[in-house]
């Protein structure tokens, strides 16, 4: 990548970019501008016009109008504006609105998706609003909403046009833009007050939603998702699936988190007053309409938790023929576009002790009845129980992701105080969990679940479970050795009776922690043990790898987990194997102190691992998770720089420095261009771009110092490059282009983060120039998230993008400020914003010359 500046486009010019990390190559004319000026400009993405995704913009006012929850999009297609579509014979009501926007200094302030060439919702060719940019013209006006469908731009019909045609229409609409949009008519509500009396099965209903866990995209409300047989809600008969909970007793449920709603419901007395909103419009069998309030839930699966003779639980399942679900949040394929990604799957909570049937499926995808079904619980379930003071616990289970249509059923398992049967089949990793306990009759507890192991995949065990028996062998009073022997000799199929005991386990953990602290203090005071303290040494380091204390079996005392990029205050580095440390937080040192592996220990284990990999693995083999085989199995997620086998990344000595400039930002890896787009669009007052240099002659419409710094002498620019005055430079069509240190400094000293589109080599050059950038690497988890976030990528393109990212980490891993991972673009974007906020200064940690 030869150009560092991240800039917007003029309407008649394409942005120059050698290569987008997650899209096709663009070898168009190199033409960068400094900033967007005048109403004729629109901030667009980096791709060719035919590939442009977004129409971003903003106005200069600081007031941001609050965005209201938008109705969910619907799968319809209207041939004309006069035709009202029908879904399954039911009329769907729309409202139409003409919205006039005055284009701000940089555009209209919203993003779009869809078109005849890339439908956003099903087969609907419409152009849909996917994002309202805070502070932009659309947000200030307040009328345009996410999921609005644009039918006309001024006098141009865009109801059935390609994506690029819609973008072109918006770009050429002038400074005053009239949008004619269609949206689904809002659902009217009737507010009802319901008085419930808690019975032996609690309140007897399930909820979903809340701030940060939206059940319906754009809506933070708490919704009823299931009515439990025999519960108070079913006996009363008025509460229905799809009802919106407004108040519980005197507590409002508007704009609360899911956990807050659960806590409010849990802490109620025997008499509970609910205020609920009921939808007054019924959409019959429209799967995209609101809930059908005529039924508590869809026809149930024959899916029961049965009580065994000994009080344990047996699982039994049979499936009825598939029929469309009565209520469905937005299906996955409706949220597929580059700028907007779906929120995380919502958490569901059950307000009763034990569900006799699983929660109703959220939606069905079209499948043949003879296909196999995926039976899993992708969401944590909270069971609020039989007893008023029963504990609320969570349980989650992994579900297998598949790109093919599948049916997901929810399974409710009681984890509170009731013994339950768990059947596991040993795999190559054994049973996949660790145990602790067995002293003084305190019991045997599950302390760790190995990711991907049999226990993890079953979802039936969790940390804090007490193991009561194994294949009929009573372990309630067993020692640790007896329990380990019973599990080891249990054969391939192991039947476990487990009971969730979070309070007992917490007391046990506290006891162990105290014992470890005593051992630590004794070894330090006596000079014996595994920690030698002949010469106490203190320093600050930046972690260059991830460390999980729960996976390190060699710990002599309480460990301290950390992530790549964390700053650690090493209090005692005198021991060859183990150091004592605290994690440094914004306000100083963390209270938590623990043991971490020393630099020597990390490097020794990594070299041993590399020898094993070279012996066992084929050259260049990388597994589906992007890890070299064997990496991190013992908790050490260390890395070795490619081509530098002697340089193993462990810890980097750092020192704290005060800066008087705003740090440049370099984002590397897949999706970096979209993250850069959103940062500049959402925070135009905080992020900017610099003006590049070129030896190309100036064109008539260009302004020196705004579009480029035009260098008269090629010899002079070559001399400046040799003198390291440029962080990155290259040649295109016999002309030199590059970004100078001075251009970056100009932006940084004026209080803006300079967004730089550069290679990893520029990080070190900026550090040498005393402009320490915030360098964030976006590390893909696997191919699947890449293809989910960019639906246009083929598997081959995704593989190339993935491989480029792995090489990028191997080459420049030592220079990254942070590494972020996520399943959605929104998740990655939020993590990047958090890193930038935390690393902005004025006090930052920079590499020091101290030797470890």
From Swiss-Prot:
Q: Where in the cell is it found?
A: Cell membrane; Postsynaptic density; Synapse; Cell projection, Axon
Q: Which residues form the SH3 domain?
A: 536-606
Any one GO biological process: receptor localization to synapse
Task: Please give the residue positions where the record annotates the modification Phosphotyrosine.
Answer: 58, 505, 732, 737
Outcome of mutating residue 7 to S, per the record? Loss of palmitoylation and targeting to postsynaptic density
Highest taxon in the source lineage: Eukaryota
Q: Which UniProt keywords apply?
A: Cell membrane, Cell projection, Lipoprotein, Membrane, Palmitate, Phosphoprotein, Repeat, SH3 domain, Synapse
State the family named in the UniProt similarity comment for this chain: Belongs to the MAGUK family.
Per its record, how is this protein called by name? Answer: Disks large homolog 2
């Amino acid at each position: 990548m030869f150009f560092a500046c991240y800039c917007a486009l003029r309407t008649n010019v394409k942005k120059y970019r050698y290569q987008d990390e997650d899209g096709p190559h663009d070898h168009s004319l190199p033409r960068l501008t400094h900033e967007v000026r005048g109403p004729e400009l629109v901030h667009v993405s980096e791709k060719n016009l035919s590939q442009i995704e977004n129409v971003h913009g903003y106005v200069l006012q600081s007031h941001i109008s609050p965005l209201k929850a938008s109705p969910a999009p619907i799968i319809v297609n209207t041939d004309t504006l006069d035709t009202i579509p029908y879904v399954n014979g039911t009329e769907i009501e729309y409202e139409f609105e003409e919205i006039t926007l005055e284009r701000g200094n940089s555009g209209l302030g919203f993003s779009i998706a869809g078109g005849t060439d890339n439908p956003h919702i099903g087969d609907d060719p419409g152009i849909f609003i996917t994002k309202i940019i805070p502070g932009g013209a659309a947000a200030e006006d307040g009328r345009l909403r996410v999921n609005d469908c644009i039918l006309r731009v001024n006098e141009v019909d865009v109801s059935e046009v390609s994506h690029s045609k819609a973008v072109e229409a918006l770009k050429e609409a002038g400074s005053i833009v009239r949008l004619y949009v269609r949206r689904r008519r809002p659902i009217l509500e009737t507010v009802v007050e319901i008085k419930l009396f808690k019975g032996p099965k609690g309140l007897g209903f399930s909820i979903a939603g809340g701030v940060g866990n939206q059940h319906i995209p754009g809506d933070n409300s708490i919704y009823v998702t299931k009515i439990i047989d025999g519960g108070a809600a079913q006996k009363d008969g008025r509460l229905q699936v799809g009802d919106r909970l407004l108040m519980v007793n005197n507590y409002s449920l508007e704009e609360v988190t899911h956990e807050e709603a659960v806590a409010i419901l849990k802490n109620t007395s025997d008499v509970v007053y609910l205020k609920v909103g009921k939808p007054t419009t019924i959409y019959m069998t429209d799967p995209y309409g609101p809930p059908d309030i005529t039924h508590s839930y869809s026809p149930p699966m024959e899916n029961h938790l049965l009580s065994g003779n000994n009080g344990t639980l047996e699982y039994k399942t049979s499936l009825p023929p598939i029929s469309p679900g009565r209520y469905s949040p937005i299906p996955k394929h409706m949220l597929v576009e580059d700028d907007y990604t779906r929120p995380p799957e919502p958490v569901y909570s059950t307000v009763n002790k034990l569900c006799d049937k699983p929660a109703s499926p959220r939606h069905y995808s079209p499948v043949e009845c003879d296909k196999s079904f995926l039976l899993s619980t992708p969401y944590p379930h909270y069971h609020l129980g039989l007893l008023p003071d029963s504990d609320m616990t969570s349980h989650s289970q992994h579900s297998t992701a598949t790109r093919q249509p599948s049916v997901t059923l929810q399974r409710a398992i009681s984890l509170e105080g009731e013994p339950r049967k768990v059947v596991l089949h040993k795999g190559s990793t054994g049973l996949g969990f660790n145990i602790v306990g067995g002293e003084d009759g305190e019991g045997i507890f599950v302390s760790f679940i190995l990711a991907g192991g049999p226990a993890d995949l079953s979802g039936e065990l969790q940390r804090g479970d007490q193991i009561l028996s194994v294949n009929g062998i009573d372990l309630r009073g067993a020692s640790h050795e007896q329990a380990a022997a019973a599990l080891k000799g249990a054969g391939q199929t192991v039947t476990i009776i487990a009971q969730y005991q979070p309070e007992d386990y917490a007391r046990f953990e506290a006891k162990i922690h105290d014992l470890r602290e005593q051992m630590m203090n004794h070894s330090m005071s006596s000079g014996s043990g595994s920690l030698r303290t002949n010469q106490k040494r203190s320093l600050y380091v930046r972690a260059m790898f991830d460390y999980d204390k729960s996976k390190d079996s060699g710990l002599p005392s309480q460990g301290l987990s950390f992530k790549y990029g964390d700053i650690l205050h090493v209090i005692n580095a005198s021991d060859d194997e183990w150091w004592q440390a605290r994690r440094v937080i914004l306000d100083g040192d963390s209270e938590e102190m623990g043991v971490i592996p020393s630099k020597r220990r990390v490097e020794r284990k990594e070299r041993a691992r590399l020898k094993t990999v070279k012996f066992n693995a084929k050259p260049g083999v990388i597994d589906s998770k992007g890890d070299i085989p064997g990496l991190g199995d013992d908790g050490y997620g260390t890395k070795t720089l490619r081509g530098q086998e002697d340089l193993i990344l462990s810890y980097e000595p750092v020192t704290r420095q005060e800066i008087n400039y705003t740090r440049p930002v370099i984002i590397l890896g897949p999706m970096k261009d979209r993250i850069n787009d959103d940062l500049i669009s959402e925070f135009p007052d905080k992020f900017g771009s610099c003006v590049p240099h070129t030896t190309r002659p100036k064109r008539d419409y260009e302004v020196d110092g705004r579009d480029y710094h035009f260098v008269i002498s090629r010899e002079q620019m070559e001399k400046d490059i040799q003198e390291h005055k440029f962080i990155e430079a290259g040649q295109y069509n016999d002309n030199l282009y590059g970004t100078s240190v001075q251009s970056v400094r100009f932006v940084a000293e004026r209080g803006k983060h300079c967004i730089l589109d550069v290679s990893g080599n520029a990080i070190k050059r900026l550090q040498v120039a005393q402009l320490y950038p915030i360098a964030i690497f976006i590390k893909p988890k696997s191919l699947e998230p890449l293809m989910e976030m960019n639906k246009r990528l083929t598997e081959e393109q995704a593989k190339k993008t993935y491989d480029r990212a792995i090489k990028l980490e191997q080459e420049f891993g030592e220079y990254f400020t942070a590494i972020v991972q996520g399943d959605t673009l929104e998740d990655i974007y939020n993590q990047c914003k958090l890193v930038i906020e935390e690393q902005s200064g004025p006090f930052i940690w920079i590499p020091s010359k101290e030797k470890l």
